[in-house]
Amino acid sequence: MTLGSRVTTLESGNAAEADASSRGWFVGDLAGWAAERGESFDPSSTPRQSADVQVKWFVHPPGHARAGWAEPDRCISLCVLLDGEMRCDFRSRDGVEEPVRLTRRGDYVIWHGPSWAHTWRTESGCTILTVRWPVGEALKQR
């Protein structure tokens, strides 16, 4: 049942098993991710469909690394370490690099996407919860 654009359904599950994108994202543009895979999806079927926020649960194996730099995006991103260790590297528009190490349960890094490119590498196997949401013009376009 929906009320306006708000889903009034209650849903519970397991984030690791609810991956809708094949990349760990389980809240966000589920319909868009299904379309990328050629699948059909009814966005009104779950409160996990959202244009306002994306949530990712991902278990990384030891030594897992992002291939290259993720270009700055118009969103704010928050990564929270649940277990293991991860190194995140950030590069500002003027070329300044900032390393961040997440080593203790609950360590986090948050950044405003338009300001920073980023990449990462796991030091050991780790589990990360990532939340991102649009800001500024990106939010106005939704």
Where do the protein language model's features map onto the residues?
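Short hydrophobic/aromatic-rich beta-strand segments that constitute the beta-sheet cores
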Residues: 88-90, 111, 128-130
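Residue-level recognition of conserved beta-strand positions in structured domain cores
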Residues: 57, 90-92, 122, 132
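Histidine-centered metal-chelating micro-motifs
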Residues: 65-67, 87, 107-119, 137
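Double-stranded beta-helix
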Residues: 2-14, 117, 121-142
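Short acidic-glycine-tyrosine-enriched beta hairpin
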Residues: 92-115
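A short, N-terminal "cap"/entry segment at the start of jelly-roll beta-barrel domains
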Residues: 1-62, 67-68, 100-101
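Short, surface-exposed beta-edge/turn micro-motifs
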Residues: 55, 75-78, 106, 126
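Glycine- and acidic-residue-biased ligand/ion/polar-headgroup-sensing regions
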Residues: 73-93
